Amino acid sequence: MTDESIASGIATAQWPGRLERLSESPAVYLDGTHNPAGARELLSFWEENLGDRRILLVYGAMRDKAVDEIAGLLFPRADAVILTQPRQPRAVSASILAEMTNHFAKSSFVVSDPLEALDRALQMASPEDAIFATGSLYLVGELRAHWGQQKQAPTPAVSGQLHR
């Protein structure tokens, strides 16, 4: 195996659920960020790639995650946050998430069902906006499965780059 073939493999690698772009207009991304380090990377992606684009954030998390720190990093940059809950016993309910994190958000909504939360974001979005669903790999998995049944196949967000 040559260095070139290794570099080529890395450049074309895709990691489902990690900055995975599902559509263009509006841009819809799935990102399994569930810890502060991942939130910082997602925030860097926003700063480097989105400029002043409006961001709608669909967020759901597990009880054992650093929700307060993640929300403190991501929510202030999002124009609207839609709080939801993955269908897992360890998930924080959307209403409790709201109590914990509303002070970080410019605007927030509670939509407990993840599929309805994504639909709400799509209804709120203009073609130029970016929607990100994040906070839990379980949430990303649910939305990815639903999107695959309802929409087009996903495309990589950033060709040739691995994130995390």
List PLM regions with ranges.
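Nucleotide phosphate-binding/pyrophosphate-handling subdomain across enzymes
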Residues: M1-A80
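C-terminal helical cap/extension that packs against the catalytic core
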Residues: A27-Y29, D68-A130
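Active-site catalytic pocket residues across diverse enzymes, especially alpha/beta-hydrolases
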Residues: W46, L50, T101, A125, ...
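Short, flexible loop segments at boundaries between secondary-structure elements
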Residues: P86-R90, Q152-R164
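Active-site-proximal loop/hinge segments that shape catalytic or ion-binding/gating pockets
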Residues: S136
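Short, active-site-adjacent cap segments at secondary-structure transitions
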Residues: L139-G141
